[in-house]
UniProtKB/Swiss-Prot annotation:
<dbReference type="GO" id="GO:0019288">
    <property type="term" value="P:isopentenyl diphosphate biosynthetic process, methylerythritol 4-phosphate pathway"/>
</dbReference>
<dbReference type="GO" id="GO:0008661">
    <property type="term" value="F:1-deoxy-D-xylulose-5-phosphate synthase activity"/>
</dbReference>
<keyword id="KW-0460">Magnesium</keyword>
<comment type="similarity">
    <text>Belongs to the transketolase family. DXPS subfamily.</text>
</comment>
<feature type="binding site">
    <location>
        <position position="79"/>
    </location>
    <ligand>
        <name>thiamine diphosphate</name>
    </ligand>
</feature>
<dbReference type="GO" id="GO:0052865">
    <property type="term" value="P:1-deoxy-D-xylulose 5-phosphate biosynthetic process"/>
</dbReference>
<dbReference type="InterPro" id="IPR029061">
    <property type="entry name" value="THDP-binding"/>
</dbReference>
<comment type="pathway">
    <text>Metabolic intermediate biosynthesis; 1-deoxy-D-xylulose 5-phosphate biosynthesis; 1-deoxy-D-xylulose 5-phosphate from D-glyceraldehyde 3-phosphate and pyruvate: step 1/1.</text>
</comment>
<dbReference type="GO" id="GO:0030976">
    <property type="term" value="F:thiamine pyrophosphate binding"/>
</dbReference>
<keyword id="KW-0808">Transferase</keyword>
<dbReference type="GO" id="GO:0005829">
    <property type="term" value="C:cytosol"/>
</dbReference>
<keyword id="KW-0786">Thiamine pyrophosphate</keyword>
<comment type="function">
    <text>Catalyzes the acyloin condensation reaction between C atoms 2 and 3 of pyruvate and glyceraldehyde 3-phosphate to yield 1-deoxy-D-xylulose-5-phosphate (DXP).</text>
</comment>
<feature type="binding site">
    <location>
        <begin position="120"/>
        <end position="122"/>
    </location>
    <ligand>
        <name>thiamine diphosphate</name>
    </ligand>
</feature>
<feature type="binding site">
    <location>
        <position position="181"/>
    </location>
    <ligand>
        <name>Mg(2+)</name>
    </ligand>
</feature>
<dbReference type="InterPro" id="IPR020826">
    <property type="entry name" value="Transketolase_BS"/>
</dbReference>
<keyword id="KW-0479">Metal-binding</keyword>
Length: 632
C-alpha cells in the first residue's frame, strides 16, 4: 500500500486514454511517478536503465498529444521504451520485464497493440514509420499520425539516412523525433554527432513558416501548384533567416528545434502545434540519458544497464567474482592488447560497443589503434576491409545478432578479396534476457556457405586466445571467431598462446559406442552429460571438439564415420544450416550411415529468459544432452 501511494496518478493510468483525461498541469507529476517506478523496479530487476529515464517527458507528451494506438509511435532500438510499456497497460506486469514468460524486453506487436513495430536493433524506425505514414495516406486515413522516435546514437546508422532520404519522395505526414542525448551505450561518435551539437534554427523562421502553413490548410486552398509555390517561398525565407545549412531541410524535411526534452508541457505544446502540418517533419530535442537519477546522469555508459543497485545510495551491487572464470569479452580485450603490443599491424574496430565487447581495453592503452565507428555494422566491416587492403590487420568485433546487418559487406568486401580481417562475433548463441532480437542464433548457418572464410569457435578461454593468435599470423585470410556472452570455464586463463592448425579439431575423450561432436563452449555442457550418461548406462562415449566449422576436420570426421553407428552433435546455434547440418552432409557425401541426433536451437525465435532457463527449454543443457545420449 505504501508503494502504491508513491504512484497516485500512475495507478489511475491503465491506458493512454486515462492519461489524456488529465489536465496538463498534472503531467510533471506523472513524469515524476513514472521515473520513480522505473527506478524502483530496475533496482531489483535489472534492465536498460539510462535510456528509459532520459525519455520520460517525451513518452508522456507523445501519449498525451497523440491518439495512440490509432496514431503510431515507432521506437528505434526500443531500450528506451519502459515508460511506454508502463503507460500502455503493462504497469502491473512491469515487474516481470525480461523474465521468462514475462513482458518482453523491447516493444513487440505480439505483446501489445501500442507496440507498432518490432525493435531491438538500431536505425530502423524512420523507414518503418515512413512506410506506415505512406500506407495511411494510401488508405485515406489523413487523420492518422505516425511518429518515429530515434536517438541513442541510432542516427549514425546508414538505414536512418536511407529513410531520411526517401521521406519526402511520397506524400506523408511523418513526424521524426530526434532524441539527442549524445550517447549510444558509449559516447556517440562521428560527424553527425558534431553536427547535432552545433545545429541551431531560427525561431522566427519556424514561426512564420508554421503560421503560413496553417493559414493555407485552414482555408483549404493547398493544391499541388500552391504547394510548390510554398516550397519556393520557404527556400527564400530560409535563406534570409537561417544562419546555416540544415541537412534535414536539405532533404525537404521540416526541422523544428532544438528544444528541451525534459519540459513536458512545452513538449506537449510543440507537438500539438506541429502534428497536423503537412509533409515530413523533424523535431529535435535535447535530453540527458539517466535523467532524474544522479549517478546515471554522471556515468551514462555504466548506467545503460547497471544490474542490481541500491536506489537510495546509487551504489551498484557488484557480485564478487573472485575465483570465477573471466568473461569471454574480457579475455578478448586483454588478448587483443597483448597481441597488438607485439604486432604493429593490428587495429581494433567496433560499431558503438567498445565497453560491451571490451575493445575499450585496447582503445585506452593505444587510442590511435582503436576505432569506434558508431552504430554502423556494414561500414565497420568494409572499413576494416579497406585497412586490410593496405596492410593493416583489423580485429572487427561485432555482436553476432548485429553482424546480420553486414552480411553483404562480409561477402562482397571481405571474402571475395580474401582480405586479412578477423571478425570476432561476440554474444554468439543464446544471450538471455534481451530475447530474440539479440540471440546470436544464426551466424554459424550464415557464415558457413561463404567461400574463403575460416569459421571457428573456442571451447574455452585458452582456445580463444590461441585462435586470436592464429588469426593474426600472416596470410590467414578472413577469419571468423565466435564466442558467447558471459563467463568461460577456466579460472586460470592466461595460457601461453600458440598456433592452432586451421581446420583441425581434437578428440577430448576416447569412446567406442557413441560419438559426441561439439562446437564451442557448449561442449562443457556435453562433457558433463557424457559423464552422467556413462555412469547411468555403462556405455563408452567419445567426445570430439570440432573447433572449426569451416574448413571441417575431414580426417576426424572420417574416423567418426568409420567407427561409430551413433553420433550426437551439439551446437549453440540454429539447427537448420548449422554445424549438425554440416556433419549430416559430410556423412551423406562420404556414404557413411550413422544414426545422427542433433542438439541446437529449434526453428523458431527463442524467447527471453536467463541463458540457463533457455538452454533447458531448448534441450541444450546437461540434462537435455543426457536425455539424448541415453535415448539410443
Amino acid at each position: 500500500m505504501e508503494q502504491d501511494n508513491l504512484y497516485n496518478l500512475l495507478q489511475s493510468i491503465d491506458t493512454p486514454d486515462d492519461l489524456r483525461h488529465l489536465s496538463a498541469d498534472k503531467l510533471p507529476e506523472v513524469c515524476k511517478e513514472l521515473r520513480q517506478k522505473i527506478i524502483d523496479e530496475l533496482s531489483c530487476n535489472p534492465g536498460h536503465f539510462g535510456s528509459s529515464l532520459g525519455v520520460i517527458e517525451l513518452t508522456v507528451a507523445l501519449h498525451y498529444v497523440f491518439n495512440t494506438p490509432y496514431d503510431r509511435i515507432v521506437w528505434d532500438v526500443g531500450h528506451q521504451a519502459y515508460g511506454h510499456k508502463i503507460l500502455t497497460g503493462r504497469r502491473d506486469a512491469f515487474c516481470t520485464n525480461r523474465k521468462l514468460n514475462g513482458i518482453r524486453p523491447f516493444p513487440s506487436p505480439s505483446e501489445s497493440e501500442y507496440d507498432t513495430f518490432t525493435c531491438g536493433h538500431a536505425s530502423n524506425s524512420i523507414s518503418a514509420a515512413l512506410g506506415m505514414a505512406v500506407a495511411a495516406k494510401k488508405h485515406g486515413e489523413n487523420n492518422r499520425h505516425v511518429v518515429a522516435v530515434i536517438g541513442d546514437g541510432s542516427m549514425s546508422g546508414g538505414l536512418a539516412f536511407e529513410g531520411l532520404n526517401n521521406a519526402s519522395a511520397t506524400p506523408n505526414n511523418l513526424l521524426i523525433i530526434l532524441n539527442d542525448n549524445n550517447m549510444a551505450i558509449d559516447r556517440s561518435v562521428g560527424g553527425m554527432k558534431q553536427y547535432l551539437l552545433n545545429l541551431q534554427m531560427s525561431e522566427g523562421y519556424n514561426r512564420i513558416r508554421y503560421k503560413i502553413s496553417q493559414m493555407f490548410h485552414r482555408w483549404g486552398i493547398l493544391n499541388e501548384e500552391r504547394r510548390k509555390s510554398l516550397i519556393r517561398f520557404n527556400n527564400s525565407l530560409k535563406s534570409m533567416l537561417v544562419q546555416q545549412q540544415n541537412v534535414f531541410e536539405g532533404m525537404n524535411i521540416r526541422y523544428f528545434g532544438p528544444i528541451d526534452g525534459h519540459d513536458v508541457n512545452n513538449l506537449a505544446r510543440v507537438l500539438k502545434e506541429i502534428k497536423d502540418m503537412q509533409g515530413p517533419k523533424l523535431l529535435h530535442i535535447h535530453t540527458t540519458k539517466g535523467k532524474g537519477f544522479g549517478p546515471a546522469e554522471k556515468a551514462a555508459t555504466i548506467w545503460h544497464a547497471p544490474g542490481i543497485f541500491d536506489k537510495e545510495t546509487g551504489e551498484r551491487i557488484v557480485v564478487d567474482t573472485k575465483g570465477m572464470p573471466p568473461l569471454f569479452q574480457d579475455v578478448f580485450g586483454n588478448t587483443l592488447l597483448e597481441l597488438a603490443q607485439t604486432n604493429d599491424k593490428i587495429v581494433g574496430v567496433t560499431p558503438a560497443m567498445p565497453s560491451g565487447c571490451s575493445m575499450n581495453i585496447l582503445m585506452k592503452a593505444m587510442p590511435e589503434r582503436g576505432f569506434d565507428v558508431g552504430i554502423a555494422e556494414g561500414h565497420a566491416v568494409t572499413f576494416s576491409g579497406g585497412m586490410a587492403k593496405d596492410g593493416l590487420l583489423p580485429f572487427c568485433n561485432i555482436y553476432s545478432s548485429f553482424m546480420q546487418r553486414a552480411y553483404d559487406n562480409v561477402i562482397h568486401d571481405i571474402a571475395i578479396q580474401k582480405l586479412n580481417v578477423v571478425l570476432c562475433l561476440d554474444r554468439a548463441g543464446l544471450v538471455g534476457e534481451d530475447g530474440p532480437t539479440h540471440h546470436g542464433a544464426f551466424d554459424l548457418a550464415y557464415m558457413r556457405p561463404i567461400p574463403n572464410l575460416i569459421v571457428a569457435s573456442p571451447y574455452n578461454e585458452h582456445e580463444l586466445r590461441c585462435l586470436m593468435y592464429t588469426a593474426q599470423l600472416p596470410d590467414k585470410g578472413p577469419f571468423v571467431i565466435r564466442y558467447p556472452r558471459g563467463r568461460g570455464s577456466l579460472v586460470d586463463w592466461k595460457c601461453p598462446m600458440q598456433e592452432i592448425e586451421i581446420g583441425k579439431g581434437r578428440k577430448l575423450k576416447e569412446g567406442k559406442d557413441i560419438a559426441v561432436i561439439t562446437l564451442g563452449p557448449i561442449g562443457v555442457q556435453a562433457e558433463k552429460a557424457i559423464t552422467h550418461a556413462e555412469q547411468e548406462t555403462g556405455k563408452s562415449i567419445a567426445h570430439y571438439d570440432l573447433r572449426f566449422l569451416k574448413p571441417l576436420d575431414e580426417s576426424m570426421l572420417h574416423e567418426i564415420g568409420k567407427r561409430f553407428k551413433q553420433v550426437v552433435t551439439v551446437e549453440d546455434g540454429v539447427l537448420k544450416g548449422g554445424m549438425g547440418s554440416a556433419i549430416l552432409e559430410f556423412m551423406a557425401d562420404n556414404e557413411y550411415n550413422p544414426q545422427i541426433k542433433r542438439i541446437g536451437l529449434p526453428d523458431q525465435f527463442v524467447q527471453h529468459g536467463s541463458v540457463k532457463e533457455l538452454y533447458h527449454i531448448c534441450g541444450m543443457d546437461e540434462e537435455g544432452i543426457y536425455k539424448v545420449l541415453i535415448s539410443f
